Regions:
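Generic beta-sheet signal
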Residues: 3-5, 32, 79-84, 116
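Conserved P-loop
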Residues: 1-71, 127-129
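Non-transmembrane, aqueous-exposed alpha-helical and coiled segments at domain scale
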Residues: 73, 78-79
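Detector for Asparagine
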Residues: 16, 22, 46-47, 76, ...
């Protein structure tokens, strides 16, 4: 399942993500992973959650993010929930690339039964049609 929180800065996307991360950590029997650029969520996220600062890995494009997610999924078969905060920022504001990323990663997530949630800072009207079904 893919879920996307979209909206402009200050619309509560990250707050919703934090609540979902912590709720997932309380109920999962596997591993919860949260990817962000920087470490602003370190005090907000349950300490059992694997919090990854993507900037430590020089990920700057949607293609690189896809490779990173594939690597995480292949190395950790027990991931049940994957969260990405500010996905569009991680992808250098490349909306087309992010759209390709979401469509490419979907079958991998479904095959492994991984719940996937990401936030993107964008006006709702500018969300590509292929991503609109995932809007939360």
């Amino acid at each position: 399942m893919i879920k996307i929180f979209a909206g402009l800065k200050g619309s509560g996307k990250t707050k919703n993500l934090i609540e979902l991360v912590n709720a997932a950590q309380e109920t999962t029997s596997g591993c919860v992973v949260c990817i962000e650029k920087g470490s602003k969520l370190i005090h907000e996220i349950n300490n059992k959650t694997r919090l990854v600062d993507i900037s430590e890995y020089a990920i700057e494009t949607a293609e690189q993010l896809y490779g990173f997610v594939c690597g995480a999924l292949s190395a950790n078969f027990d991931i049940t929930d994957l969260f990405i905060d500010s996905a569009l920022k991680i992808c250098a504001e490349d909306l087309e690339g992010l759209e390709k990323f979401a469509n490419a990663v979907k079958p991998l997530l479904e095959a492994r039964n991984v719940n996937f949630t990401m936030t993107i800072s964008i006006e709702l009207e500018k969300v590509p049609a292929s991503l609109k079904p995932y809007l939360a």
